[in-house]
UniProtKB/Swiss-Prot annotation:
Protein name: NAD(P)H-quinone oxidoreductase subunit K
GO BP annotations, alphabetical order: aerobic respiration; electron transport coupled proton transport; photosynthesis, light reaction
Binding site residues for [4Fe-4S] cluster: 55-56, 120, 151
InterPro entries per UniProt: NADH_UbQ_OxRdtase-like_20kDa, NADH_UQ_OxRdtase_20Kd_su
Lineage: Bacteria, Bacillati, Cyanobacteriota, Cyanophyceae, Oscillatoriophycideae
Enzyme class: translocase
Keyword flag Protein biosynthesis: no
Amino acid sequence: MVLSPNQNQKIINPIEESPTVTQELSENIVLTTVDDLYNWAKLSSLWPLLYGTACCFIEFAALIGSRFDFDRFGLVPRSSPRQADLLITAGTITMKYTPTLVRLYEQMPEPKYVIAMGACTITGGMFSMDSPTAVRGVDKLIPVDVYIPGCPPRPEAIIDAVIKLRKKIANDSLQERGQLQQTHRYYCVKHNMKVVEPILTGQYLQTSDRKAVPKELAEAIGMPVSPALQAIPKEEVSLG
């Protein structure tokens, strides 16, 4: 098979018409907006704050490994909320965790985003059945941007949630960001708790033995006996 000179030249030099750097002004200008530039830099450098409280965090730990490699999305875990802009809640949220979680969210700088990972975080999961301590939905405390259902969700689902969050950030606007509020919540069952009287009422502190040492014990250890105890007649014990 004999190739013509033109065909041979195309095969030998396939990048003959490749773009080159020119000095023309029109070829070195990029037209964009401040929102697009800001969102492009933001979605490529998300710094998450990991708030793992249960088994869902084990699946997230697998995401950090080399098999899934979430560093390709620019995710750099931070240990301080003041350096993070993404809060990932993984696991059951209890009433005792509530003040800590809200404080961490308030310490994060704007703009900040939240990913709710797992059924326990979204609706309370199996721990919310007849439990007065489990919070049925973290969106009752802080606004949530992306939900990841599952018990627990796989690392691929977390990657999909990060991609969806990046698309949401790409459409954000600096002027409208402070006005946006969460309008929809994940469905969850409300708490139906019965109010009962407290068990620890403090009545045991008002017994006579707590107010004063018994007369027999005071005499045995050599303590001074109060006049009120001295007025009590000593009981005679019959031994036979």
